[in-house]
Amino acid sequence: MKMCDMFQTADWKTEKHVPAIECDDAVAADAFFPVTVSLGKEIAHPNTTEHHIRWIRCYFKPEGDKFSYEVGSFEFTAHGECAKGPNEGPVYTNHTVTFQLKIKTPGVLVASSFCNIHGLWESSKAVALK
């Protein structure tokens, strides 16, 4: 089995597990720009001890390049766990992250995520240069 066969995809507007990548469609070369990746943007994803998003990972694949590059790995480790019991804890993290990057060529941003119940999901967004 190939790793790519383990990932599910869909439209983030209709499926709560798919990462929504938000950034400008075209950016200036070699200048930092913000990217936000979230899950459940249109349909809320649960955030409980029993059902939650554990991480989001982001990559950039430059146009015409054989290789992709890891941009960031973001873990969400608090989901209401507590010695008192599930969902009794004092802290929760939310499955949204904003970071900045700069690129020298156009390419594709790819985001993957992991739901502890429903597994691996991914999405992508093309980014052009102005």
UniProtKB/Swiss-Prot annotation:
What is the superkingdom listed in this entry's lineage? Bacteria
**From the UniProt record, which GO molecular function terms apply?**
iron ion binding; superoxide dismutase activity
Reaction(s) catalyzed by this protein? 2 superoxide + 2 H(+) = H2O2 + O2
Span-the-membrane segments of this chain are: none
- Keyword check for Membrane, yes or no: no
Under the heading CDD domains, the entry gives:
SORL_classII
Listed under subunit, the entry gives: Monomer.
In the record, the note on similarity to other proteins reads: Belongs to the desulfoferrodoxin family.
Function statement: Non-heme iron protein.
Print the miscellaneous field.
Answer: Has a reduction potential of +190 mV.
PANTHER family membership: SUPEROXIDE REDUCTASE-RELATED
Provide the protein name: Neelaredoxin
Gene giving rise to this polypeptide? nlr
